[in-house]
Curated annotation (Swiss-Prot):
Pfam families given in the database record: GapR_DNA-bd
Protein name, entry field: UPF0335 protein CC_3319
Lineage, opening ranks: Bacteria, Pseudomonadati, Pseudomonadota, Alphaproteobacteria, Caulobacterales
GO terms for MF: DNA binding
Species the sequence originates in: Caulobacter vibrioides (strain ATCC 19089 / CIP 103742 / CB 15) (Caulobacter crescentus)
TM region(s), chain numbering: none
């Protein structure tokens, strides 16, 4: 069975190997950038908290602003319906 194994260097030609290496390196660089951005976001939320803002609510506002307006309105209407049905509003 080992005789039938393809040596790893023969699996991809040199062009494909170069492309694969380039892709992997780009992803790795982006992962580093993502970590740096996440740290910056964390610092902004810490600053907001220091200024007396509720970070949990701020995160919710950011999440809501990302949503499509029509989809958000539909979800809000369904939420209101469900809350009304159980006597919460």
């Amino acid at each position: 069975m080992a005789d039938d194994a393809i040596p790893h260097t023969d699996v991809l030609n040199s062009t494909a190997q170069g492309q694969l290496k380039s892709i992997i390196e780009r992803v790795e660089r982006l992962e580093v950038e993502k970590a740096e951005i996440m740290e910056q976001i964390k610092e902004v939320y810490a600053e907001a908290k220091g200024n007396g803002f509720d970070v949990k609510v701020l995160k919710k506002v950011v999440r809501i602003r990302k949503q499509d307006r029509a989809k958000r309105q539909e979800e809000d209407a369904i939420l209101d319906l469900y809350l009304s049905a159980i006597g919460e509003i």
